[in-house]
Swiss-Prot record:
Aldo-keto reductase that significantly contributes to cellular methylglyoxal detoxification by catalyzing the NADPH-dependent conversion of methylglyoxal to acetol. It comes from Escherichia coli O157:H7. InterPro entries: AKR (IPR020471), Aldo/ket_reductase_CS (IPR018170), NADP_OxRdtase_dom (IPR023210), NADP_OxRdtase_dom_sf (IPR036812). This is Methylglyoxal reductase DkgB. GO terms for biological process: L-ascorbic acid biosynthetic process; methylglyoxal catabolic process. It comes from the Bacteria.
Length: 267
C-alpha cells in the first residue's frame, strides 16, 4: 500500500489534547495517523481511534521504534507493546525513529529485526527516519531498498534536504517530510504570503501543497479544528512553476531538529 500523501502528526501532543486532535481529524476525513513510542501518546491515540468508530481497514497508522528498543531482542517486544497501546493487531508502517547513537546497535541488526516484525505481520511496511545517505546505504545493504517504504526526515522550505531526497529517489525510497512548516516559522515568510494571497490560500496550505507537489508525504499536527480542516484542503491546491521556483529559493539549510547525542552527522 502506498504511503498516504497526507496524514496527522502527533508529536508533542499528549493525553486529552491528542485524543481531541485525533478524533477531530478523523471526523474531518483524515485517515493516516503518525505516532511514536517516545511521544508517550500511543495509548491515547489508540483510545481516540477506538472512540472514533472509524474501521481499522480505513486507517493508516505509523509508529516509530525508540533507540532503547533497537536491539534484536527488544525491537519486536516493544512493537507488540505499541500495538497493545494502539489497540490494533498491526500497524501499517513502523519506522526506526533515529539511528542508534554511536552505532551501539548496528543498522544491520535493527533493520533485520524490523523486517522480521514485518514477516510476523506486526507491521505492513517498514522504514527509517532521520537517516543520512551513508545510513540509507547500510539500511539497503541490510534488507534491500524494496523493503524500505520511506525515510521520514525534517524537510521544509528552509531545509529542502536535496542531497538526501535525490539519493532516496534514485533508490526508490519515498520521502516523508516532518516539520514541514518549520515550527511555524515558514508561515510568516513574505514569499509564502505572496503565493498564498495569489491562490487565496493560507500559508500552511501553500507549504503543504508544495511538499506534496514534490512527491513527499506530509504529517502536520494541530490542536485546532479550523487548522486541521484548512490543512486538509492543501491537497486541492496546485502551485505553478513560478511558485515552486520561489519556494526553491528559500532553502538555507536551516535545520531545527538536531538533538545532541542523537543526531547523526548530517549530509
Amino acid at each position: 500500500m502506498a504511503i498516504p500523501a497526507f496524514g496527522l502528526g502527533t508529536f508533542r501532543l499528549k493525553d486529552d489534547v491528542v485524543i481531541s486532535s485525533v478524533k477531530t481529524a478523523l471526523e474531518l476525513g483524515y485517515r493516516a495517523i503518525d505516532t511514536a513510542q517516545i511521544y508517550d501518546n500511543e495509548a491515547a491515540v489508540g483510545l481516540a481511534i477506538a472512540e472514533s468508530g472509524v474501521p481499522r481497514h480505513e486507517l493508516y497508522i505509523t509508529t516509530k521504534i525508540w533507540i532503547e528498543n533497537l536491539s534484536k531482542d527488544k525491537l519486536i517486544p516493544s512493537l507488540k507493546e505499541s500495538l497493545q497501546k494502539l489497540r490494533t493487531d498491526y500497524v501499517d508502517l513502523t519506522l526506526i525513529h533515529w539511528p542508534s547513537p554511536n552505532d551501539e546497535v548496528s543498522v544491520e541488526e535493527f533493520m533485520q529485526a524490523l523486517l522480521e516484525a514485518k514477516k510476523e505481520g506486526l507491521t505492513r511496511e517498514i522504514g527509517i527516519s532521520n537517516f543520512t545517505i551513508p545510513l540509507m546505504e547500510k539500511a539497503i545493504a541490510a534488507v534491500g531498498a524494496e523493503n524500505i517504504a520511506t525515510n521520514q526526515i525534517e524537510l521544509s522550505p528552509y531545509l529542502q534536504n536535496r542531497k538526501v531526497v535525490a539519493w532516496a529517489k534514485q533508490h526508490g525510497i519515498h520521502i516523508t517530510s516532518y516539520m514541514t512548516l518549520a515550527y511555524g516559522k515558514a508561515l510568516k515568510d513574505e514569499v509564502i504570503a505572496r503565493i498564498a494571497a495569489k491562490h487565496n490560500a493560507t500559508p500552511a496550505q501553500v507549504i503543504l501543497a508544495w511538499a506534496m507537489g514534490e512527491g513527499y508525504s506530509v504529517i502536520p499536527s494541530s490542536t485546532k479544528r479550523e487548522n486541521l480542516e484548512s490543512n486538509l484542503k492543501a491537497q486541492n491546491l496546485q502551485l505553478d512553476a513560478e511558485d515552486k521556483k520561489a519556494i526553491a529559493a528559500l532553502d538555507c539549510n536551516d535545520r531545527l531538529v538536531s538533538p545532541e547525542g542523537l543526531a547523526p552527522e548530517w549530509d
